[in-house]
Swiss-Prot record, chain A:
Belongs to the GatC family. Heterotrimer of A, B and C subunits. It holds the Pfam family GatC. Its EC number is 6.3.5.-. This is Aspartyl/glutamyl-tRNA(Asn/Gln) amidotransferase subunit C. One of its GO terms (molecular function) is asparaginyl-tRNA synthase (glutamine-hydrolyzing) activity. One of its GO terms (biological process) is regulation of translational fidelity. Allows the formation of correctly charged Asn-tRNA(Asn) or Gln-tRNA(Gln) through the transamidation of misacylated Asp-tRNA(Asn) or Glu-tRNA(Gln) in organisms which lack either or both of asparaginyl-tRNA or glutaminyl-tRNA synthetases. The reaction takes place in the presence of glutamine and ATP through an activated phospho-Asp-tRNA(Asn) or phospho-Glu-tRNA(Gln). It comes from the Bacteria. Keywords: ATP-binding, Ligase, Nucleotide-binding, Protein biosynthesis. InterPro entries: Asp/Glu-ADT_sf_sub_c, GatC. It catalyses: L-glutamyl-tRNA(Gln) + L-glutamine + ATP + H2O = L-glutaminyl-tRNA(Gln) + L-glutamate + ADP + phosphate + H(+); L-aspartyl-tRNA(Asn) + L-glutamine + ATP + H2O = L-asparaginyl-tRNA(Asn) + L-glutamate + ADP + phosphate + 2 H(+). It comes from Thermoanaerobacter pseudethanolicus (strain ATCC 33223 / 39E) (Clostridium thermohydrosulfuricum).
């Protein structure tokens, strides 16, 4: 296996996904297959190849430092399921 | 066994751009919650970030001022973690190709110069602010999300809390000089995290490091490090081991305590940001930015010595803050005695700033007002000691010096007849001292002058007082 069960559990946790035991088993097999397939790329010699930073060969796309009006707050909060005092409301975060 | 500490610092500084790093929202501090936001800084689907050119220029400027190598090729990366202050669930930052690297800052401790290495400076976006008020949830204000930051990571070159303090002071000084950040800790535009570990003296292996957070001032950094180093040494001496963790400085208790962290795994899964293209800083661009660098502290210090004839000590203190140096130069423009101005800045001005914890630009006294005060002394309107009282009032209220002098009746008594009457009275009331003086006790003179000052509440002109007193006593 290219990936262990605990690695799958770890990745799921980082992505805040919850799976049943059967699903974890199934994904471990499937993800291993995918990784094995992609691993084929490791057979290539990339010694003198620059790592790709971006697939489009352009650089330095900038904007000037100019302020433009922000969006109306009512619009900003329109789709928020919970809001209070002009803020987005989320489950209590304890520091 | 003797132990030594190994300290590294991470400093986040907000850049003084007008607009955010990837969108055109304002970076102004404060404002009603969520009024400085747009679909881009909220990370709404379908939006694309575009990098603010000034962010690159400011970061390069800071890098040059901190003796860094500027990368010719640099790129942005995504740092992934879930926390409600981060609307996209990732922060756009830089991972393996930061804009600046391998710099240094020179600090002075116990008269010796020490170089503190700067590992890297990278650009990134700030997160929003969480408000934990009296509600059943937490509230999020994204005004700060997307404000440009530079993160300056030092090498673990410091061994004492004092060195850490000196490093921060110097770093802040340079950043202020380069005008890329206003470095206001109370507004969060300068934030400090520190890593510290201890090891037996002579050991080359690093101990387990502890990250310290919630450091709201440079003094807090110093105190937290002092506490933490003692704590770690005690644990080791008792045969325990240090567990890697993040600890929070509790200012009121004066201790560090364990803190829950954002992402348990510290597994940020960085990858290149596909929405932004690489940054290339050509030599021409770099030199253009270098030319825009303002005069740095050590150059200014040398100039103040040469141009204004300030003693080295004065020049060093005055240029230790750009704001103070600017204030000084504005005064000198209208008042032709640089040393007098520097005396006031290092004396009364600094004393009151230390007492109130205010910076020079937060004080209502302007250079023009200080100059007016100095001229009042020169013209004999008030005495030097009364001027201190007037200055304190100016510092507290922002009133013009002549208004204060008028309101409080602090004008110097320079009228000869008026002063002579007061002196005559003092002589009659102090026959013992008068006799002592006539018997050759010089000290008695000082006492009598003191009595005159007391009678006039310090308003007597000192030269005139001396002169008349001598005349009257020799009668």
């Amino acid at each position: 296996m290219a990936i262990s069960r605990s690695e799958v559990e770890h990745v799921a946790k980082l992505a805040r996904l919850k799976f049943s035991q059967e699903e974890i088993e199934e994904f471990t097999v499937q993800l291993s297959k995918i990784i094995d397939y992609v691993n084929k790329l490791n057979e290539l010699d990339t010694e003198n190849v620059e790592p790709t930073a971006h697939i489009v060969p352009i650089h330095n796309v900038f904007r000037e430092d100019e302020v433009k009006p922000s969006m109306d707050r009512d619009k900003i909060l329109m789709n928020a399921p919970y809001k209070e005092n002009g803020c987005f409301k989320v489950p209590k975060i304890i520091e | 066994m003797k132990y030594e500490a190994v300290i590294g610092l991470e400093v986040h500084a907000e850049l003084l751009t007008e607009s955010k790093i990837f969108c055109s929202c304002t970076t102004k501090f404060g404002g009603e919650p969520n009024t400085h936001v747009c679909p881009v800084c909220l990370g709404l689907p379908g939006t694309l970030p575009v990098l603010n050119k000034k962010v690159v220029e400011y970061a390069v400027r800071a890098g040059l001022a901190l003796n860094c190598t500027i990368a010719n090729f640099s790129k942005m990366d995504r740092k992934n973690y879930f926390y409600p202050d981060l609307p996209k669930a990732y922060q756009i930052s830089q991972y393996d190709l930061p804009l600046c690297s391998n710099g240094y800052v020179e600090i002075e401790v116990d008269g010796k110069v020490k170089k503190i290495g700067i590992k890297r400076i990278h650009i990134e976006e700030d997160a929003g602010k969480l408000l934990h008020e009296n509600t059943d949830g937490s509230l999020v204000d994204y005004n700060r999300a997307g404000v440009p930051l530079i993160e300056i990571v030092s090498e673990p070159d410091m061994t004492t809390p004092e060195e850490a303090y000196q490093y921060l002071t110097k770093l802040k000084n340079i950043l202020e000089y380069t005008e890329v950040s206003d470095c206001k800790m109370q507004e969060g535009s300068l934030r400090v995290d520190t890593n510290v570990s201890v090891r037996p003296v002579g050991s080359t292996e690093l101990g387990t490091k502890i990250e310290l957070k919630n450091l709201n001032s440079f003094r807090a950094v110093q105190k937290a490090l002092e506490y933490e180093i003692k704590r770690q040494i005690k644990v080791l001496e008792e045969g325990g081991t240090i567990v890697q963790e993040t600890r929070r400085w509790n200012e009121s208790k004066g201790i560090t305590e364990p803190m829950r962290t954002k992402e348990e795994a510290h597994d940020y899964r960085y990858f290149p940001e596909p929405d932004l293209v690489p940054i290339i800083v050509t030599d021409e661009w770099k030199e253009e930015i270098r030319k825009s660098l303002p005069e740095m502290p050590h150059h200014k210090r040398e100039r103040f010595i040469a141009e204004y004839g300030l003693p080295e000590y004065d020049a060093k203190i005055i240029t230790s803050s750009k704001k103070m140096a600017d204030f000084f130069e504005k005064c000198v423009l209208e008042y032709d005695s640089p040393k007098t101005v520097s005396n006031w800045l290092m004396g009364e001005f600094s004393r009151l700033m230390n007492e109130t914890g205010k910076e020079i630009d937060e004080v209502p006294v302007t250079p023009q007002m200080l100059v007016k005060l100095l001229k009042l002394i020169d013209n004999g309107v008030i005495s030097g000691s009364i001027a201190k009282t007037v200055f304190e009032e100016m510092f507290g209220t922002g009133k013009e010096p002549e208004v204060i002098v008028e309101e409080k009746g602090l004008k110097q008594i320079a009228n000869e007849n008026e002063l002579r009457e007061i002196i005559k009275k003092v002589i009659v009331e102090n026959p013992k001292s008068v006799e002592d003086y006539k018997n050759g006790k010089e000290k008695a003179m000082g006492f009598l002058v003191g009595q005159v000052m007391k009678a006039t509440k310090g308003k007597a002109n000192p030269q005139l007082t001396n002169q008349i007193l001598k005349e009257e006593l020799s009668k």
